[in-house]
From Swiss-Prot:
Pathway: Pyrimidine metabolism; dUMP biosynthesis; dUMP from dCTP (dUTP route): step 1/2. It comes from Chromobacterium violaceum (strain ATCC 12472 / DSM 30191 / JCM 1249 / CCUG 213 / NBRC 12614 / NCIMB 9131 / NCTC 9757 / MK). Homotrimer. GO terms for biological process: dUMP biosynthetic process; dUTP biosynthetic process; nucleobase-containing small molecule interconversion. This is dCTP deaminase. GO terms for molecular function: dCTP deaminase activity; nucleotide binding.
Length: 190
């Protein structure tokens, strides 16, 4: 299994729609000259952005967080501000701007950007499995005792693409994975 380069990422995006919308280079500056947290193609990965749609966790109902019986009322929706404030020691969910179509022979690993990590904000994303497609649900944990800010439409994490020497017998699509084709911020599904 080998990691794929910027050339491969560009080719797969252009010829197979692997990432839409796609940015062929690193974007570090907005059109108005303001600095951005970078996104787009890097040497051996793709820096993804989060959309301006967030679900911020609150414990107003004093519930237990149970992945088999998750209470959607534990979240407050935030959108249209261009950013999200995560309360201290809490978390928020968001989705990517980019829609992904992962080839059958590819598995991705996603890692948070150092800009956020150095501020105590951890980005968690599970692997994109072979033949999975959809918008990615992102989880941001604020590990600090202070409120933390996440910027929409700027880089939040980097996706690394690994291609296997042979295709898998059963892909995510074949087994009808429960998050196949997700379009919004998707809560846990039992």
């Amino acid at each position: 299994m080998s990691i794929k380069s910027d050339k491969w990422i560009r080719r797969m995006a252009d010829q197979h729609g692997m990432i839409e919308p796609f940015e062929a280079n690193q974007v570090k500056m907005a059109a108005d000259g303001q600095k951005l947290i970078s996104y787009g193609t890097s040497s051996y990965g793709y820096d993804i952005r989060c959309a301006d749609e967030f679900k911020v966790f609150t414990n107003i109902n004093s519930t237990i967080v149970d992945p088999k019986n998750f209470d959607p009322n534990s979240f407050v929706e935030v959108s249209g501000k261009g950013y999200c404030i995560i309360p201290p020691n809490s978390f928020a969910l968001a989705r990517t701007v980019e829609y992904f179509r992962i080839p059958r022979s590819v598995l991705t690993v996603c890692l948070g950007k150092s800009t956020y990590a150095r501020c105590g904000i951890i980005v968690n994303v599970t692997p994109f499995e072979p033949e999975w497609e959809g918008y990615v649900t992102l989880e941001f944990s604020n590990t600090t005792p202070l409120p933390a800010k996440i910027y929409a439409n700027e880089g939040v994490a980097q996706v690394l693409f690994f291609e296997s020497d042979e295709e898998c017998d059963v892909s995510y699509k074949d087994r009808a994975g429960k998050y196949q084709g997700q379009v919004g911020v998707t809560l846990p599904r039992p």
